[in-house]
Amino acid sequence: MVLIRVLANLLVLQLSYAQKSSELVIGGDECNINEHRSLVYLYNDSNFQCGGTLINQEWVLSAAHCDMENMEIYLGVHNLSLPNKDQKRRDPKEKFFCLSSKNYTKWDKDIMLIKLNRPVKTSTHIAPLSLPSSPPSVGSVCRIMGWGTVTSPNETLLDVPHCANINILNYTVCRAASPRLPTQSRTLCAGILQGGIDACKGDSGGPLICNGQIQGIVSWGNHPCAQPLKPGHYTHVFDYTDWIQSIIAGNTTATCPP
């Protein structure tokens, strides 16, 4: 009963936030061309796509489950069919996973750090995003973005990224939706409780941005997407900042937190 009351109170709170947000469709509205300079498009010749985030001139952060063969990394992209003049393509020079392997699970350690084969310069449509200086608070309004499907369960992929606002929720909300989840996890629970806005297929690996910092990585969610009371799961970047900074500094044997 206590959990039901908590969910009911959170739903009222979410409804008040939703009135301030953009139209409730999966993926939100088309992103402003200048608001996603750190957003990266990962793609291969098998039409597998993911998002990522540029965190400095030669490093990209994404989800471990976004690893793919023949990965192509595009930066400064808005319209996939109409390249920007400063758009760049890079290849992965090295990829790093927790415990120096693909030893992640659906619930934990879904993080991949990619070193580019060549650095990129900051430009009109390319700029890195800061790592978090502190974890986000429950109730924080954060931004998701990506080229993923804007409908579910049927898929509709567009050439431009869509952006939307969602909220950081208490982890117990995600456990209520998925009782098999562990009692603790290095993931963030985020979404809109009444549904209608969500990251979805094709958005994996992209950022959850709160106060100008990357706080989460799109990891997994329910299908169909954007169901009421079934928020999404995001890798909690703050928990991995020491690992990320160690790898970038050259300590390639650094291990992730337990």
From Swiss-Prot:
Residues 1-18 form the signal peptide. Disulfide bonds join 31-163, 50-66, 98-256, 142-210, 174-189, 200-225. Residues 25-249 form the Peptidase S1 domain. The keyword Glycoprotein applies. The active site is at residues 65, 110, 204. Its EC number is 3.4.21.-. Glycans are attached at residues 44, 79, 103, 154, 170, 251. Gene3D superfamilies: Trypsin-like serine proteases. Its main location: secreted. Belongs to the peptidase S1 family. Snake venom subfamily. This is Serine protease VLSP-3. It comes from Macrovipera lebetinus (Levantine viper). The lineage of its organism: Eukaryota, Metazoa, Chordata, Craniata, Vertebrata.
